[in-house]
A protein has these predicted regions:
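A detector of single, family-specific signature residues
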Residues: 1-340
């Protein structure tokens, strides 16, 4: 006897609907509060029974999967966008109960679009990589604010001067900015210094991890991929065997070009940007090495740059690097994701 369950998870509550495949009996319940203790109480009724559970890969899924596996449940993590698409275009009521039922029905007829559930050490690595990516983004935003303030007050361009170096900061002090502008620049520099303090130990840990981990070492054999880009690619791409081809890995990363065509009309394509932003960042950073004289991709980059421009040429090299990374990790098999 198998019980098939659909869970719709939110911060305030988890809505559940299940069906006993032997009797056809349907049950419903809500878990409040939607925390670990509340979920354990709810799952107590299913202990000792064969359980298949579907839930979407939304915020909070990790602890739910852990608790479900504790009682021996077979867990299926649904990809949210594909799951919503399988509702069809016909308008239907959108409630938590309807969402739970939709997941349960898709799982029951084997049509659930599943996401990969990474092992715990990859989830932890992914969390650290994404934290670093967030801090780097914030650091860049504060730098952009400094540039905006300088331009707003008509300051000369800082040709060849790094604004965050000692020379650059001395140059900023000598501009004679108005008090409000000086305050903006001072606060921005202070925030950048704070972010640098937070980034330093994270970078150190990730670099050390990349030196020890087999998958990262294999990725770093490719020209342009360093310690931080390798560990980001590994964390975000995960088990490359889950993709049927390198093209599917490109789609997952959001580096594929969308196409809108009707009859003879074809709109210009753009990046789908559907995948993890940190993965696209790592690949784009690595791809910028393609313009170097020693790069094996230099000729390809120059040809693409002549037709498409430098930015799109870098994206083309990024796709090539992703395909190489996919094949490298796939060939390593289980060794690619070994804990460091």
């Amino acid at each position: 006897m198998t019980i098939v369950v659909g869970l719709d998870q939110h911060r305030a509550q988890i809505t559940a609907e299940w069906v006993d495949t032997a009797t056809g009996e349907i049950g419903r319940s809500r878990v409040r509060p939607a925390d670990r203790a509340g979920l354990r109480r709810f799952l107590g009724r299913f202990r000792g029974q064969q359980l298949e559970v579907a839930l979407e890969a939304t915020t909070g899924w990790r602890f739910v999967v852990q608790e479900l596996r504790t009682i021996g449940a077979d867990v299926h993590l649904a990809e949210p966008a594909e799951t919503a698409a399988r509702r069809g275009r016909k308008k239907r009521p959108k409630t938590d109960r309807a969402d739970a039922r939709h997941l349960r029905e898709l799982l029951l007829v084997d049509r659930l679009p599943e996401s990969w559930i990474p092992p715990d050490h990859i989830l932890d690595l992914r969390a650290r990589v994404r934290l670093r990516h967030t801090l780097v983004d914030q650091r860049g935003e504060w730098q952009q604010r400094i540039h905006a303030v300088l331009y707003h007050h008509g300051c000369p361009h800082h040709h060849g001067i790094g604004l965050l170096t000692a020379k650059g900061r001395a140059w900023l002090d000598g501009l004679g900015l108005p008090s409000t502008a000086l305050e903006q620049v001072t606060v921005a520099l202070g925030m950048i210094d704070v972010l640098d303090v937070q980034l330093a130990p994270i970078d150190k840990q990730l670099r050390a991890y990349a030196r020890r981990q087999p998958g990262c070492r294999a990725l770093m054999a490719h020209y342009g991929i360093g310690h931080l880009t390798a560990v980001t690619i590994l964390a975000e791409l995960g088990d490359a065997r889950r993709f049927s081809s390198s093209r599917e890995a490109v789609r997952y990363a959001g580096l594929d070009i969308t196409v809108k065509q009707s009859d003879k009309r074809r709109a210009p394509g753009h990046l789908s940007r559907q995948g993890p932003p940190a993965l696209r960042w790592a690949l784009y950073e690595a791809a910028q090495s393609g313009r170097r004289h020693s790069s094996p991709d230099r000729d390809y980059y120059l040809q693409a740059a002549e037709r498409l421009g430098g930015n799109r040429a870098c994206l083309a090299v990024a796709r090539k690097l992703l395909k190489r990374s996919y094949h490298t990790l796939r060939e390593l098999g289980d060794q690619a994701l070994q804990p460091a």
